[in-house]
Amino acid sequence: MSQSSVDIPPKGGFSFDLCKRNDMLTQKGLKAPSFLKTGTTIVGLIFKDGVILGADTRATEGPIVADKNCEKIHYMAPNIYCCGAGTAADTEAVTDMVSSQLRLHRYQTGRDSRVVTALTLLKKHLFSYQGHVSAALVLGGVDITGPHLHTIYPHGSTDTLPFATMGSGSLAAMSVFEAKYKEGLTRDEGIKLVAEAICSGIFNDLGSGSNVDICVITKGHKEYLRNYMEPNPRTYVSSKGYSFTKKTEVLLTKITPLLERVEIVEVAGEAMEE
């Protein structure tokens, strides 16, 4: 071991060098990029045979609708799915990472994944980043211990509830659940209630919109109902599209030449000496 490596004092687990750099750049006039507001409505509930998850399909970039039919219900394991709200890249990256870890665990043990295992992996990862990973999740699944539903916040805190909502449209969706949820719901009653909660978020929140996706998870079976409901169908003025007059439209009557005629005269003479 070299003497230089021994003389270096040990550092802590977190470095604030980049924070100081960003503060210095801001003082010199650099405008830091602003955060874009995100919008989503994701929900979940437990019914008598399993778990039902639901989500809208609108993705936004501030005031712009970036995608009208994106998927917000992510695969975690054959018996576990997860709805994501927040930054789309963060939710997809986090769920894909944990999904791969669950698959390796199944290969190692030969057993089905448990919902609490996925919950622990997600909350530990999000807590380590102190909320800078913008992923708010609703995790649901059915394992050997029964149906489970959890919410995971970007800072790593979790809740275990019989019904849950997250996202910018969560208050509107929660009002539907609190008014109509009851224990022992059937599959059809649960799907209807989840769809109504998502529609409430779609119609009362500008960040939510487009269609309704639903995922039903029971013991040994899952059913992904893509575009189960389309409360805002895309309509046109004419079913045949736009039509134009069948003739040439006169745009200009005055013609302006681009260049005037220029005469070029060739001058005879001796070449210049170098």
Swiss-Prot record:
Task: Report the superkingdom from the record.
Answer: Eukaryota
Excised during maturation, the propeptide residues are: 1-37
Which organism is the protein's source?
A: Arabidopsis thaliana (Mouse-ear cress)
Instruction: Give a GO cellular-component term.
Output: plastid
Subunit and interaction comment: Component of the 20S core complex of the 26S proteasome. The 26S proteasome is composed of a core protease (CP), known as the 20S proteasome, capped at one or both ends by the 19S regulatory particle (RP/PA700). The 20S proteasome core is composed of 28 subunits that are arranged in four stacked rings, resulting in a barrel-shaped structure. The two end rings are each formed by seven alpha subunits, and the two central rings are each formed by seven beta subunits. The catalytic chamber with the active sites is on the inside of the barrel.
Family label: Belongs to the peptidase T1B family.
| Free-text function comment from the UniProt entry | The proteasome is a multicatalytic proteinase complex which is characterized by its ability to cleave peptides with Arg, Phe, Tyr, Leu, and Glu adjacent to the leaving group at neutral or slightly basic pH. The proteasome has an ATP-dependent proteolytic activity.
**Which Pfam families does the UniProt entry name for this protein?**
Proteasome
Record's protein name: Proteasome subunit beta type-7-B
**Which UniProt keywords are listed?**
Cytoplasm, Hydrolase, Nucleus, Protease, Proteasome, Threonine protease, Zymogen
Q: Where in the cell is it found?
A: Cytoplasm; Nucleus
What PROSITE patterns does this protein's entry cite? PROTEASOME_BETA_1 (PS00854), PROTEASOME_BETA_2 (PS51476)
Catalytic residues identified in the record? T40 (nucleophile)
PANTHER family, per the entry: METALLOPROTEASE TLDD, PROTEASOME SUBUNIT BETA TYPE-7
SUPFAM superfamilies linked to this entry:
N-terminal nucleophile aminohydrolases (Ntn hydrolases)
Please state the Enzyme Commission number of this protein: 3.4.25.1
Catalysed reaction equations from the record: Cleavage of peptide bonds with very broad specificity
In the record, biological process GO terms are: proteolysis involved in protein catabolic process
Q: Which InterPro entries match?
A: Ntn_hydrolases_N, Pept_T1A_subB, Proteasome_bsu_CS, Proteasome_sua/b, Proteasome_suB-type
Drop me one GO molecular function for this one: threonine-type endopeptidase activity
